[in-house]
Amino acid sequence: KHFILRDKSRVAVTYASPVHFIKNGKWVENEPGLVQKNGRLHNTQGAFSASFALSGEDEGGSVIQWEGKSVSFRALGNRVGGTSQARVSNASPERTGLLSAQELMKSNSGTVSYDGVFTDASLEYKIAWNGIKEDIIISSRGGQYKYGFVYTLSHGLAMSLNSAGCGDKRQ
């Protein structure tokens, strides 16, 4: 896709996942977002179903479901008192006047953030058509750099470490 930025320059953007899909016989924009339903946040479009807790301390955490399988996860926060409420920003259908390609990419995803879920860090999940990107945002240098999560896998899924030492799903 090509976009015109505020300064009248043009940027060509390629995507790793579909940006259009057919709905009722017509091509429509894929604009992943989040809506609140049944006390949780749910993605509006995508190749999978995801739901997120309204609070970072909610034992329900986050759940991703696809093809009859599911993964649920939640942070083991070390927060002292208080709660971390979810903050949502959704994909923006209005893409004119963007300053940069980074703004463009951010405008094409739904995001849920939990500020202060850890004493010195926040969590942010960006929802795209084919996946979720988790970012741990550290608020101060020299703080804690170990963060714990609880995962629950279903239907024959198992976790293992890949060559980079990161969790990798296996069937």
Where are these regions (language model features)?
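Residues that cap or anchor secondary-structure elements
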Residues: 1-171
